[in-house]
């Protein structure tokens, strides 16, 4: 064939287009096979029982289906013909695409044979590679087509529906049906078709021999050759890494195996006639048990080849070779690849370390980086496909590698280095192209003996393009584009490889060598990312997810491999590379796989890291707990006993010797590994993996590993804080707030110390967790310490205080437990003193304290509701008492008519206990707030001081609400005002409500003398209170009055004065009582009057003096003191 014809045939362009088209068709066949093999995604009518007879008929008669005379068989198809057409059009067109692809492939292969093209991977690399790729892609398409079990039904049913709808079958059906029948036994038909192409195919494959032998060496040979080592020869470290066949150095061995196995499978004739072909074929058979057709679809090399050759005459020796090779693979390949992986781990780690330290070496040694990536990818893919498919083996350890994560991590490390230092690579290779390659190419062109015009124009353009390059283009961030140059070189390879070409490439190897070098250098300027994908793409994991997950699980079990575990989420970013524009429907599924597995891997890593952090926190908390003051009692006791002679020399039996804090640091031998050591080691490894990358992308989603860790840490810290509280709903036990605070501080202190190592925002994690603990429920809907402590204080401490087993001691500023048998299991003072209230405020914060206050106020208002009911029941009598309280005779007849007076006092005391507890909690909050925010506390207190009785009530309440949130005490409690305001009143008018409030104070005032009869109403100087908590009445009277009269917009002072007068009269009348039982604790009760005045800012001692002589109070104090000392 003439040279002009070679130009016209456009072999390079057709190979490029058909290879890309072939990949698309192959993926479509894969997608159809995958869809039809899964009942969930299979076309619905293929699963319908009513359609079964039609499907059997179509399958049996295919392709000769008589649609018009088969209505009884095809009735269901006729009913659903429109739906079938709609659903199967894509499937049918995909099969038509296969047929058209086949036609174009054979046309091109025949043209190449007619041109008598010469193939040599070392010279015309692109031409040879594209030729072999096309053969393998075409074979894979046909093999996959034959593996689609429903192919006849899909094609036949579509054609039947088409004929029913349009009156005639699809024009392509006849040829398509015939093609499907021909490829029922695909390899037999393919070998027949490829017989004429044996010379070209075998020639191309034989050019691989030297390269394949060199790339198929074992780890020992690699080691002795110092493969990938930059430091084995220091003087040559900056010399450019060149080769006569640059692209061959990082060409995948898996790709070569596919070429050789499938090539000799189709053109097997040369195996008996050519010893070189036979040697190459046998060597390749000893490499793998399986080769990949596409994704997880594989060809079982030895079985398929043996089955084919066994059916052919004269191939007995080849069958024996196959069996021998299979035995060799089973016996040796696992160990062979295991040793190569071990070598690569060491060699690539060294390479990465050197390049990271001296990134400038990426210029001259860029080839080493891509070789390393290609070698790792080959070993990983070999392991994956054999682990997936080799199910029965005597040596399962050959197909499992617990250190695979390190290899994946190194692959990602090299990729990251190349991307990070892309400018270094570009600057070096731009100068190489402009100052060396262009000059050498120019010299070679001038020395060519023959150079046709077309070739001359192309090569001259090469020199021109390369000579025009300058460094400013890199500095200015200019985008380079050399795809045109590389396509021209591809064309030139085609032109110079035909038999009758004036310029033969194999006669001018120097031209091929320099052009292959130029192609690599040009790719370093504009296609580094594509080259990274070509050499290191591991998207195969997207289709071997079970193996992927298994490898990840094995990595987590090896503590030494934990630091490399981040490689698995990073590999998920590769999945985007397995998509193809001819099969867009795959994209969402692949995206889901990538994101789901990336998410699950990071979730597991974050979970493991947070577990490790929290375990160490728990250990730290245990150490911190040993330093609590309560543990020093034993030490003090022992020290005291040493001074006495009675101390025993030996400890009592059953009393274990308690280790002193710090004993855990004493170690006789450093080889002794403690649990803390193991945890710290694991945490170090996990921190390295979680902190390896700040972010990366998976299918256009940006992933931040630190966010996974932050969310897990936050959730775990929330649960840990609640666990530290030790709340037991059955026994109503809970940890003291001060002890919980010490534990929380131990946790927080350790997490803060890890901030710079974990990569997570430790401050944010702590802030969020602690903030959530100030709410009733956390972000997961679980109870927080705010809820637990609120419930405990209400249900345990305050309930017992209401029943009289716990009293408020103003002297101790705490609630105190009274010594009674079997009624309580905790000491009230340990949970309510100043330090505990401060710790509670520190833990719950302003929000938590507000929640606590709201719950307290709910209980207060429920008591107020009951009090109002009692007032309403006695309203008529109370109205008379209010008018006649100064008339003893009338009062003597009215007072006995009151009902529920003791109940009123009891409920008011409960309110007082609750409000007293709230006041103590508020004081704790004020101290904490002053400590944390003194610059805020000052202005708040100053603002409160500006409030006067004349200030608008809304403004007053707003200021008091602000002050109350900071823990500052107020004359009017805004929380109580709001709680009472929220009570749903009945139909009574505001005037009636106000009247009830006034009468409530009257009811209380006239009921006070009843307290004198209670033996518990004795005033204790030691506790500065009463054993029945009636001293809390004063707070209840003042706070409730202030809230009620604020709500009704009345003068608080006036009504409190009225209360003082009525109460004074009632107590003075008690002095005239002759019954000693009724006056038993008269003096103690009299002291309540002074307590009321001290509690209120609205009342003064002068006001009290006007209605209750101070001499009585003085006498009462003296009597109480005398009685206390006598007792």
UniProtKB/Swiss-Prot annotation:
GO cellular component: cytosol; extracellular exosome; ficolin-1-rich granule membrane; membrane; plasma membrane; SCAR complex; secretory granule membrane
Biological-process GO terms, alphabetical: actin polymerization-dependent cell motility; B cell homeostasis; B cell receptor signaling pathway; cell migration; cell morphogenesis; cell projection assembly; chemotaxis; cortical actin cytoskeleton organization
Pfam families: Nckap1
Entry annotated with the keyword Transmembrane helix: yes
Gene Ontology MF terms: GTPase activator activity; protein kinase activator activity; protein-containing complex binding; TORC2 complex binding
Key words of the record: Cell membrane, Cytoplasm, Disease variant, Membrane, Transmembrane, Transmembrane helix
Domain of life: Eukaryota
Lipid bilayer topology: Single-pass membrane protein
InterPro entries: Nck-associated_protein-1 (IPR019137)
Outcome recorded upon mutating residue 519 to L: In IMD72; loss of function; decreased protein levels in T-cells; decreased interaction with WASF2 and poor formation of WAVE2 complex
Region spans: Disordered: 638-670
Tissue expr: Expressed only in cells of hematopoietic origin. Expressed in neutrophils (at protein level). Expressed in T-cells (at protein level).
Mutagenesis or variant effect for residue 359 to L: In IMD72; loss of function; decreased protein levels in T-cells; decreased interaction with WASF2 and poor formation of WAVE2 complex; T-cells display excessive degranulation and granule release; cells exhibit reduced cortical F-actin and aberrant membrane spikes and WAS-mediated puncta, defective cell spreading and lamellipodia and reduced migratory velocity, as well as abnormal activation, blunted proliferation, decreased IL2 and TNF production and defective TCR-induced phosphorylation of mTORC2 complex substrate AKT; homozygous patient neutrophils migrating in chemokine gradients exhibit reduced velocity and directional persistence, unusual elongation and misdirected competing leading edges; no effect on interaction with RICTOR
Subcellular location, record wording: Cell membrane; Cytoplasm
Function: Essential hematopoietic-specific regulator of the actin cytoskeleton. Controls lymphocyte development, activation, proliferation and homeostasis, erythrocyte membrane stability, as well as phagocytosis and migration by neutrophils and macrophages. Component of the WAVE2 complex which signals downstream of RAC to stimulate F-actin polymerization. Required for stabilization and/or translation of the WAVE2 complex proteins in hematopoietic cells. Within the WAVE2 complex, enables the cortical actin network to restrain excessive degranulation and granule release by T-cells.
Family stated for the protein in its record: Belongs to the HEM-1/HEM-2 family.
Protein name, UniProt field: Nck-associated protein 1-like
């Amino acid at each position: 064939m003439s040279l002009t014809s070679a130009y016209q045939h456009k072999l390079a362009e057709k190979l490029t287009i058909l290879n890309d088209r072939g990949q698309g068709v192959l993926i479509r066949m894969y997608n159809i096979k995958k869809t039809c093999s899964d009942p969930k995604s299979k076309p619905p009518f293929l699963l319908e029982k009513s359609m079964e007879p039609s499907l059997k008929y179509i399958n049996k008669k295919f392709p000769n289906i008589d649609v018009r005379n088969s209505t009884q068989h095809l009735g269901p198809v006729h009913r659903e013909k429109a739906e079938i057409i709609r659903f199967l059009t894509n499937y049918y067109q995909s099969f038509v695409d296969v047929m058209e692809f086949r036609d174009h492939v054979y046309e091109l292969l025949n043209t190449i044979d007619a041109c008598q093209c010469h193939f040599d991977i070392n010279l015309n690399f692109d031409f040879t590679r594209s030729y072999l790729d096309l053969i393998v892609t075409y074979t894979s398409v046909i093999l996959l087509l034959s593996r689609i079990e429903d192919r006849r039904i899909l094609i036949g049913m579509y054609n039947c529906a088409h004929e029913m709808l349009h009156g005639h079958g699809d024009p392509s059906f006849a040829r398509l049906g015939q093609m499907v029948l021909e490829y029922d036994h695909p390899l037999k038909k393919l070998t027949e078709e490829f017989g004429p192409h044996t010379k070209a195919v075998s020639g191309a494959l034989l050019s691989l021999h030297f390269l394949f032998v060199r790339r198929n060496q074992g780890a020992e040979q690699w080691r002795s050759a110092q493969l990938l080592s930059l430091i084995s020869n220091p003087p040559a470290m900056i010399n450019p890494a060149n080769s006569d066949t640059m692209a061959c150095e990082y060409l995948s061995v898996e790709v070569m195996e596919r070429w050789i196995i499938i090539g000799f499978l189709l053109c097997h004739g040369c195996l008996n006639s050519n010893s070189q072909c036979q040697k190459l074929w046998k060597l390749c058979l000893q490499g793998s048990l399986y080769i990949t057709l596409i994704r997880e679809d594989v060809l079982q090399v030895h079985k398929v080849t043996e089955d084919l050759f066994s059916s052919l005459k004269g191939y007995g020796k080849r069958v024996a070779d196959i069996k021998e090779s299979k035995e060799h693979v089973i016996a040796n390949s696992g160990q062979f690849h295991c040793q190569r992986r071990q070598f690569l781990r060491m060699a690539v780690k060294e390479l990465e370390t050197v390049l990271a330290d001296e990134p400038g070496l990426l210029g001259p040694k860029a080839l080493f980086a891509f070789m390393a990536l290609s070698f790792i990818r080959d070993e990983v893919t070999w392991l994956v496909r054999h682990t997936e498919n080799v199910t029965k083996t005597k040596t399962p350890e050959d197909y499992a590698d617990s250190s695979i994560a390190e290899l994946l991590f190194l692959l990602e490390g090299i990729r990251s280095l190349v991307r990070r230092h892309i400018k270094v690579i570009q600057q070096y290779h731009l100068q190489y192209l402009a100052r060396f390659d262009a000059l050498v190419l120019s010299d070679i062109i001038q020395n060519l003996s023959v150079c046709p015009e077309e070739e001359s124009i192309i090569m001259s353009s090469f020199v021109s393009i390369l000579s025009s390059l300058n460094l400013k283009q890199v500095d200015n961030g200019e985008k380079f584009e050399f795809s045109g140059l590389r396509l021209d070189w591809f064309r030139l390879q085609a032109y110079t490889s035909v038999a009758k070409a004036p310029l033969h490439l194999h006669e001018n190897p120097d031209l091929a060598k320099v052009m292959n070098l130029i192609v690599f250098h040009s790719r370093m300027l504009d296609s580094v990312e594509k080259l990274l994908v070509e050499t290191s793409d591991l998207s195969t994991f997207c289709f071997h997810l079970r193996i992927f997950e298994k490898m990840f699980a094995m990595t987590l079990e090896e503590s030494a491999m934990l630091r490399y575990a981040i490689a698995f989420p990073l590999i998920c970013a590769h999945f985007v590379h397995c998509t193809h524009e001819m099969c867009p429907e795959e994209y969402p599924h692949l995206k889901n796989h990538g994101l789901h597995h990336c998410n699950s891997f990071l979730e597991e890593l974050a979970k493991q890291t947070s577990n490790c952090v929290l375990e160490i926190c728990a250990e730290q908390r245990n150490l911190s707990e040993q330093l609590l003051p309560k543990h020093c009692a034993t030490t003090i006791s022992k020290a005291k006993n040493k001074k006495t002679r009675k101390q025993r020399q030996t400890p009592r039996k059953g009393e274990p010797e308690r280790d002193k804090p710090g004993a855990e640091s004493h170690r006789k031998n450093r080889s002794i590994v403690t649990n803390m050591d193991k945890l710290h080691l694991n945490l170090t490894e996990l921190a390295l993996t979680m902190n390896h990358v700040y972010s990366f992308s998976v299918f256009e989603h940006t992933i931040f590993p630190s966010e996974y860790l932050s969310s897990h840490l936050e959730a775990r810290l929330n649960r840990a804080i609640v666990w530290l509280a030790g709340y037991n709903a059955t026994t109503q036990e809970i940890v003291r707030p001060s002890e919980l605070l010490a534990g929380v501080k131990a946790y927080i202190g350790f997490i803060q110390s890890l901030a710079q190592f974990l990569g997570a925002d430790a401050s944010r994690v702590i802030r969020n967790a602690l903030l959530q603990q100030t709410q009733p429920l956390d972000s997961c809907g679980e109870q927080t310490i705010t809820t637990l402590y609120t419930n405990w204080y209400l249900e345990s401490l305050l309930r017992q205080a209401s029943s009289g087993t716990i009293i408020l001691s103003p002297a101790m500023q705490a609630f105190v437990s009274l010594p009674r048998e079997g009624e309580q299991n905790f000491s009230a003072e340990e949970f309510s003193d100043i330090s505990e209230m401060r710790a509670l405020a520190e833990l719950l914060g302003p929000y938590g304290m507000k929640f606590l206050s709201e719950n307290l106020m709910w209980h207060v208002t429920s008591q107020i509701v009951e009090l109002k009911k009692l007032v309403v029941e006695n309203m008529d009598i109370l109205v008379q008492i209010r008018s006649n309280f100064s008339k003893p005779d009338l009062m003597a007849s009215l007072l006995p008519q009151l009902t529920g007076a003791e109940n009123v006092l009891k409920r008011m005391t409960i309110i007082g206990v609750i409000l007293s507890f709230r006041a103590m909690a508020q004081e704790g909050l004020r101290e904490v707030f002053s400590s944390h925010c003194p610059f805020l506390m000052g202005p708040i207190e100053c603002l409160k001081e500006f409030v006067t009785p004349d200030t608008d009530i809304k403004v007053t309440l707003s200021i008091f609400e602000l002050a109350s949130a900071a823990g500052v005490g107020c004359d009017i409690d805004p929380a109580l005002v709001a709680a009472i305001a929220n009570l749903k009143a009945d139909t009574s008018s505001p005037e009636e409500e106000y009247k009830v409030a006034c009468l409530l104070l009257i009811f209380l005032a006239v009921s006070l003398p009843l307290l004198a009869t209670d033996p518990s109403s004795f005033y204790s100087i030691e506790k500065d209170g009463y054993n029945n908590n009636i001293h809390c009445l004063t707070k209840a009277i003042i706070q409730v009055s202030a809230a009620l009269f604020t709500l009704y917009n009345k003068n608080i002072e006036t009504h409190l004065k009225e209360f003082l007068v009525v109460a004074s009269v009632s107590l003075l009348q008690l002095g005239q009582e002759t019954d000693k039982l009724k006056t038993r604790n008269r003096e103690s009760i009299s002291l309540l009057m002074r307590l009321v005045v001290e509690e209120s800012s609205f009342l003064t001692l002068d006001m009290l003096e006007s209605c209750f002589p101070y001499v009585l109070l003085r006498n009462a104090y003296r009597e109480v003191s005398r009685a206390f000392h006598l007792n």
